[in-house]
Regions:
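Non-catalytic beta/alpha edge segments that cap or flank active sites
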Residues: 1-176
Length: 176
């Protein structure tokens, strides 16, 4: 199995935030699939075109699985001072087919969006930026992932519920 990890976000690219999720992804995949080949790509800036190009390179290199970590949230829908959701825009634009789910807070703001889909023969998923949420989503993915029978909806639902369970009951309002 050939796996590519693409960390996204200006904060990771510039070294403002340390990418701890990639190390966890590597560790967990090596535990479950000791013969897999994993490559962590150079972090990608928050620009839709850059993220699409990074995914294109991974798919062209015949990656079985492409994992994007972090990126921008959906806060720009509520405040123009918050950044655009580049990672999810890129996923929606690039993938041939996909499933997506969102978690909203009691204030109505988007807290998390997870996408899993296909491009050619590659499965592409994203993990949230916050480490605890990323670990929960990855653990859920690994529980349900079967390289021989990929069910996008099942993968997406398992991952989003795992992330939802990381929030206190009084704060996370609903899953869409």
């Amino acid at each position: 199995m050939n796996i590519s990890i693409i960390p996204t976000g200006d904060e990771i690219l510039l070294g403002i935030v340390v990418d701890t999720s990639s190390a966890y992804i590597l560790q967990e995949f090596i535990k479950k699939y000791p013969d897999c080949e994993i490559t962590r790509k150079t972090p990608v800036a928050d620009k839709t075109d850059n993220i699409i190009k990074a995914m294109e390179r991974c798919v062209a290199s015949k990656a079985d699985l492409v994992i994007l970590t972090g990126g921008s949230g959906g806060g720009h829908r509520y405040s123009s001072t918050l950044s655009e959701d580049y990672t999810h825009c890129a996923l929606g634009e690039y993938l041939d087919e996909f499933e997506e789910s969102e978690i909203y807070g009691s204030n109505g703001h988007l807290w998390c969006k997870l996408v899993c889909g296909r491009k050619k023969k590659s499965l592409v998923i994203n993990l949230p930026g916050p480490y605890v949420e990323a670990c929960a989503a990855l653990d859920a993915f690994l529980e349900v992932y079967d390289p021989k029978e990929i069910k996008l909806s099942q993968i997406n639902q398992r991952m989003i519920h795992a992330v939802y369970n990381q929030y206190p009951n009084t704060q996370a309002s609903y899953i869409k």
